[in-house]
């Protein structure tokens, strides 16, 4: 099977995270031939590919062209990382041209800017793996499942469940640390709470979340505007 990794506008962390699979990369290479991945190879091709991993937001005209090319060439497209699935931090920008002007003045942008949007706003996506960055073990298992003809299953539970399964102390109730775990999609194995930190919501909203209830709980700890800021950082709740 042929695998392509396509990067749009982002910090580069999601593509780099794939390389941090280390020895497991060798396991993947038993199933996949890397057709395109600029962090790992200078090879580029126009051939059809079986699986495309797309990271980043669509923020420029070039991004949109790369995304459409990846979709047209691939049988199975995965939006990888919260930029691709929800828009993430840069998705907060509602007017990219105005944001550019505030930083750089009235000069002409070097590229055609678009308001940052997730991959899912532009093309059909076969599977989505959120996270900033995503859990590399999750993407490894998804790729192995696809190679074996098994349809991957999205996580449909909140981070809170993973805290319970790992028997972590609840940082929200026990330590009064702001935590979005009750309303954030699981799949990270409760990484932040495992270090005694509150979940920052980087995987976006969970199914059947109760954001109004979460807001009321957090009001006992934070002012309203700070709660709203936390909820808007990675996804549009």
UniProtKB/Swiss-Prot annotation:
Keywords, comma-separated and alphabetical: 3Fe-4S, 4Fe-4S, Cytoplasm, Iron, Iron-sulfur, Metal-binding, NAD, NADP, Nickel, Oxidoreductase
Record: residues binding [4Fe-4S] cluster 2: 160, 163, 170, 179
A GO MF label: hydrogen dehydrogenase (NADP+) activity
Localisation: Cytoplasm
pH dependence: Optimum pH is 8 for hydrogenase activity at >95 degrees Celsius.
EC number: 1.12.1.5
Keyword Acyltransferase: no
Classification via Gene3D superfamilies: NADH:ubiquinone oxidoreductase-like, 20kDa subunit
Any Pfam family: Oxidored_q6
Named cofactor requirement(s): Ni(2+); [4Fe-4S] cluster; [3Fe-4S] cluster
Enzyme class: oxidoreductase
Protein name according to UniProt: Sulfhydrogenase 2 subunit delta
Organism (species): Pyrococcus furiosus (strain ATCC 43587 / DSM 3638 / JCM 8422 / Vc1)
């Amino acid at each position: 099977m042929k695998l392509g990794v396509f990067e749009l506008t982002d910090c580069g962390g999601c593509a780099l995270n794939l390389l941090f699979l280390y020895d497991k990369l060798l396991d993947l290479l038993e199933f996949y031939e890397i057709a395109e991945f600029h962090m790992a190879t200078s090879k580029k091709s126009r051939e059809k590919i079986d699986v495309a991993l797309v990271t980043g937001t669509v923020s420029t005209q070039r991004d949109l062209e790369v995304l459409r090319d990846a979709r047209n060439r691939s049988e199975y497209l995965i939006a990888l990382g919260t930029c691709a699935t929800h828009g993430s931090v840069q998705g907060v920008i509602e007017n990219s041209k105005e944001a550019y002007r505030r930083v750089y003045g009235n000069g002409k942008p070097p590229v055609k800017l678009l308001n940052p949007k997730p991959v899912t706003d532009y093309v059909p996506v076969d599977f989505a793996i959120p996270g900033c960055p995503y859990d590399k073990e999750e993407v490894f298992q998804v790729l192995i499942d696809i190679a074996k003809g098994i349809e991957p299953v999205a996580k449909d539970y909140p981070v809170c469940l993973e805290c319970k399964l790992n028997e972590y102390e609840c940082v929200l109730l026990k330590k009064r640390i702001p935590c979005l775990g009750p309303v954030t999609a699981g799949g990270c194995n409760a990484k932040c709470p495992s270090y005694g930190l509150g979940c920052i919501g980087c995987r976006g909203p969970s199914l059947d979340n109760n954001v109004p209830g979460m807001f009321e709980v957090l009001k006992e700890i934070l002012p309203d505007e700070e709660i709203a800021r936390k909820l808007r950082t990675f996804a549009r709740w």
